[in-house]
Amino acid sequence: MVSVQNLKTDQLLNFLFKNPTKFLSRFSPMAKNKTLVTPSTVKKSSDVASTSKKLSGVASPAKKPSGVTSPVKKPLEAVASTSSEEEEEDEPSSDSESGSESESDTEAEPMTLAAAAPSSSNEKRQSEGKPEEERAKTETETGKKPLLFQRLWTDEDEIVFLQGMIKFAKDTGKNVSEDMNGFFEKLKDSISFEVKTDQFVNKIRSMKRKYIENKKTTTEHDKKCYELAEIIWVSDGDATALVKPKKKKLKVDEESDWFERSFVDGAFKELGPGVDEETWKKNWSLVPVKKRKRIEEKVKSMQADELKTTWQKIDVVHEMRSLMAKYV
């Protein structure tokens, strides 16, 4: 007798269609287990199998199509096949989970790189902003911005410098331009910084230009410096002695020459016999300048009148000679 378990699917179907009553009587235990196969169920299963084949022919882009179990399998192998299919379905899920984890890992790596790139740019910006922050910090600590040009000469240095020029001329009788080295050696220790000779020369020029030529007196310090500069370069007293001693000497010589050329010298000798010429010159030099100039103008006017009178005398003499030549 042929066993149903050893029959193939086609043979089982033929046997079922030919001997349905015999099949039901022989295999009643299978009917009790609800595994009985009738022609209607076989027809339905064939339809399902054909439909599953059609569906399995279409490939899914995301996942592999899961295999559809045919209902016309061997009865004893059904449970094992279903359990194996469940295990296979579990395995792809685990594979998909591992794949999703790997995909998440691969996606996380660019994110970390992208996050690292802005951090490096932020560090660069922070490093570039450090000098500005340090400069702002120094400004807040000191309370003022750092000066691009620091002034060497202080107000006190300028006052000491001008006073030193006046004192040097009085003590030595020399102009600072005549003995710049001596003036430098005498005053360099009184300046607040380590000064050089060329700085002394430039300072004299700049202060003369500022206070004498431009007459800049905007502050109290400028006013004090202007007063000292007037003593050195403007006034008749100390200015002539400090800055222009040669011109004054020349002026004194011109006055002495005028004194000698004028008739006053002879008149003094006539009016005061017994007084030598040097005494007269010395006494005359003690007279104020304005009064001496007034006398000088009078003398020049008298000399001009005398010259005019002399030319008139000469004209008279020529006229007399011409008349005598005509009538003699």
From Swiss-Prot:
InterPro entries in UniProt: GEBP (IPR007592), GeBP-like_C (IPR053933), GeBP-like_DBD (IPR053932)
Superkingdom classification of source: Eukaryota
Comp. bias (Polar residues): 35-54
Descriptive protein name: Probable transcription factor At4g00610
Biased composition (Acidic residues): 84-108
Keywords for this protein: Transcription, Transcription regulation
Annotated Basic and acidic residues bias: 122-143
Lineage start: Eukaryota, Viridiplantae, Streptophyta, Embryophyta, Tracheophyta
Any Pfam family hit: GeBP-like_DBD
Region (Disordered): 31-143
Homology family: Belongs to the GeBP family.
Biological process annotations from GO: regulation of DNA-templated transcription
